[in-house]
Amino acid sequence: MSNNPHRTHKRQKSSVSNPGYYFTPETKSEIQQQQPQQQESQQQQQQQQQQHSQTHNIYDNDNYMNYNFPPTSNRPRASTTTGTTSTTHPGSELSHESHSVHTSPLKRTASSELDQPIPAMAPSSPLVSSAPYYYQQPSQQQNLSYHDHHHQQQQQQSTPQGQQLSQQTQSNSQSGVPPPLYGTSSSIPPGSTMQPSTSFAFHTSHSTYNPSFDSSNLYNSAFRLPEYPTTSSSSLLSTTGGKQFQQSSALLPSGTLPPSILGTSSSSHVSALRQHQKNNLSISSHLTLFSLSGNNSSQLQSQGSSFQQSETGVDDTKRSSKESTTIFNDLLFHLTSVDGSNINTFLLSILRKINSPFTLDDFYNLLYNDRQRTLLDNSNYQNRIDKTIVSPSDTDMTVSIINQLLNFFKTPSMLVDYFPNMEDKDNKLANINYHELLRTFLAIKILHDILIQLPISEDDDPQNYTIPRLSIYKTYYIICQKLIASYPSASNTRNEQQKLILGQSKLGKLIKLVYPNLLIKRLGSRGESKYNYLGVMWNANIVQEEIKQLCDEHELNDLNEIFNSDNNNPFASIAPSGSATTGSTPRRGLSHKRTSSKQKIKTEPVAGNPFLQPLQTSHHHHHSHHHHHEEQSQEESLSQQMGEHITAPRLSFLRANSKYPTDVNLSVLDDDNWFVRLSYECYARQPALNRDLIQQIFLKNEFLLNNSSLLQNLMDSIIKPLVMQETYSNVDLVLYLAILLEILPYLLLVKSSTNINLLKNLRLNLLHLINNFNNELKKLDSPKFPIERSTIFLVLVKKLINLNDLLITFIKLINRDNCKTTMSSDIENFLKINSQTVKLDDDDNSFFFNLNTTSMGEVNFNFKNEILSNDLIYTLIGYNFDPTTNSELKSSISMNFINEEINVIDEFFKNDLLNFLSTDFHAGLDDDNGEEDDDEEAGPGSTHPMGATGSQGSLSPEPVSTGNPSVPPTRNTSISEVNAENKRGNEAVLTPKETAKLNSLISLIDKRLLSSQFKSKYPILMYNNCISYILNDILKHIFLKQQQQQLQSSSSQLHDTQPLTQQDTAQGIGSSSSNANNTNSSFGNWWVFNSFIQEYMSLIGELVGLHDNLV
């Protein structure tokens, strides 16, 4: 055995690399007084290190950890006696102690990408260090650091001098001297060669092939550390008075170092790797318990009871919080240099540095379902996909570290808080796609755990342990599908979750990353050979027979068809298998029950709406099992029949087969209506909701003075408490429905207490809510309030505001006699009778098309046949729906059925609407006042344009309205008086006469267009679209007829041969202009009316759909 000269430094070694610095054969007083004796003792210790380093193996030495400080920076006595020569750094509580992290020689060779140093740190980082070397290649350098403290402790304790040194260690630790971060070796019998099991679980096994850290770099300018005394974090309060440490750590999370420390001396974090337990056969263990070569079998067998005792001690001891902090700080230090080019390497380093058993089930739920806690803490062992047994302490530590690291990727600006010297431009985390990071992290974890790379010796043939390359991807694909089916996401559908599966090319790159030295060879007969990985085997805890059978018997295309088909999916009903044991909270229980999971999967191809699939949980705890099963079977049968020809909108709560309730009163005007009962049901379903608080936030004018008041109160008083409380499932939907039901009567103006100021402030606050609500939810980042659902809620809020605009505009318009007259005339002339088309000359090219050739320009036009019948037939054909059988349209439908269906709609437009326009609603006023009011509103000075109540949410009352029914307004009312009256804000938005008209219109729609005849036969989507077709065709028909009248009038004026005087000409032009204005006003009235009906029916349908998602 050669004795290579040990490389030495010119500067004195610190306590880490020089154990004789603190402990010499002399007494404590002699240490402080005799410097020559210290140097002699240090030389002796260095010789022992040289001799020891040549006879043992060293693995996984973290280069940047092994900083060796000069003696003057760590001498406890010198720091207290020579205060003028040493300075205390504010963030110096981090103990810079060097460790060589060792692993078993049976451990497989790790990623070569990890061997390469992570790219250079950002320029703002105070220290630049090389990447940690967990797995080294052969080198001839020797390690100067103190790498085998356990062995030396045993040598010291075996002699009286060693016992004295051990006593000095305890005395020094009490006096503020940082003790080495090693576990005690008292459990190891004297003379045993087995390495002790420490608090860091360093199972040391040395090798002469392990490279050492080139300590000559320690004193380069890039690695130089400030010379100030360092103390351990536990003793900082006593040495510094506690002021600086308390100030720096006041805002820090538990278990992390202060940013000031990480910004100045972050290169000294200690890496603490830990081997897996005996029962864990994931790839991180790498067969540490056996070897095919048998090189170390005799050593393991010779340990006997000592080995068992050591292993038991590791199993029973929880990993200390100090170790968790060390690992996190180590990873956090490397996070500063992470960008898109090395993110995969960093993710792999997280798993290897934590090096603790953590099941795929917990890992998947940590990434996609619940980052605050483990979802499977109470689940049955047999129901897990990964059967690896783990300890709760290891799981908690892993969850804590990964959660903290993921927060940096979600909020990259947090990194600057931990590293104050780092500039924003050097922070590359913002350029990393978070979704891509999560699915890549999951893929690395799966690859890391499903395979075991065997350490093949020269006598073993690696071809005895082979796995086809395609089988690895198919196994990865199957496991992802199994995780998706077993643990449905609360915010995404199964189709959305499919996006987390990587393609073959990217997974192949990750295989090379995780297993860089894995041998690959084409095996098989000529023409049928396939690429196989050599020297690997499956982890039986994860890859079980069921997965192997699917992988061996099916090609990749067949697997895609199997998992995309609900009938053939072998894991479609896996999720509820452990539901009985996972119901520690109501939310967990409802999200993992068999019926709800199956229903999600069964109805997904029907609805085609990715936002609604998580909402379709069966409300089984309110119904009997038999009734629920029967109802579900009927719904699934109807869904299967309609699934191919009806698709729900993406931003909608409606399902494909949602229908209006038939046995309830849908009119908002009645006291005991469906909306009132639904509101009570919402608060009964979620007791955590406070109705008085919601009404106070939304409907009290004093809480709506600022545009942001509603949003701030909603977040602080309602949503944030709901996030912290234990609530039932779909709490967000219940809250949204309760809010819509509370503000619905106010925006529809059916509440008599609605005044101008309240409506104006409410609209402004709702507009602010629409623009900023999703941003607040993103900051909250709670699975209880997914963005997909809140987006649909905001669409409904915007629909309510638009409905309020249309409603006010239409009521104000039809309150004028000329508007009522023109609309009534349109019905009499164009809809009620068989209108005759005026024949124009063929050479008349004054219009953009010939009106005689249009379908609505026929001589004998029939509104019932040409519009109503055709639109209903087009709707049934377009949706491929037969209302007589409530199924797919397979045969023709008789015209008698069509005529019977449209009779109600025909009666609505020809008679009901005409009576509504012709009836005067005076609301208790005498006729004179009503006529004067109408005349006044028809005047040119009191017009009410549509833009007065536009999307900006600004409302203004009628300029001439005084709000007093008994006092009619006058034309001579000054503007100042009107403005002064409006400022009082106590006037109602509508006059009593207008309110009566509004109530009549809403009642007409509820009872005629939403009659039971249509509600029982047609889905909401189909019926609402049919009404929209009819309204649009009516609008087009009226427009064409009005254009015909204008053309006829202009043609008659051109053919008039009588001479016109100048006065007659002016009168003719004025008359023509007046007719044109009337025509335009009539068309505008019809447009507002049509838009109001469509928005109103759409809103009612959405409320029904939202309710259906809760039952």
Swiss-Prot record:
The keyword Transcription regulation applies. Residues 450-540 bind DNA. InterPro entries: DNA-bd_RFX, Mediator/Homeobox_domain, WH-like_DNA-bd_sf, WH_DNA-bd_sf. PROSITE patterns: RFX_DBD. Belongs to the RFX family. Residues 1-199, 300-320, 570-642, 925-988, 1050-1076 are annotated as: Disordered. Residues 1-13, 589-600, 618-628 have a biased composition (Basic residues). GO terms for molecular function: DNA binding; DNA-binding transcription factor activity; DNA-binding transcription repressor activity. One of its GO terms (biological process) is cellular response to oxidative stress. Disruption phenotype: Leads to increased resistance to UV-killing, derepression of various stress-related genes, hyperfilamentous growth, and overexpression of hypha-specific genes. Transcriptional repressor which regulates DNA damage responses, morphogenesis, and virulence. Involved in the regulation of filamentous growth through its repression of hyphal-specific genes such as HWP1, ALS3, HYR1, ECE1, and CEK1. This is RFX-like DNA-binding protein RFX2. GO terms for cellular component: NELF complex. Induction: Expression is negatively regulated by NRG1, and by the contact with host oral epithelial cells. Up-regulated during the yeast-to-hypha transition through the function of YAK1. Also regulated by SWI4, SWI6, and WOR1, a transcriptional regulator of white-opaque switching. Pfam families: RFX_DNA_binding. Keywords: DNA damage, DNA-binding, Nucleus, Repressor, Transcription, Transcription regulation, Virulence. It comes from the Eukaryota.
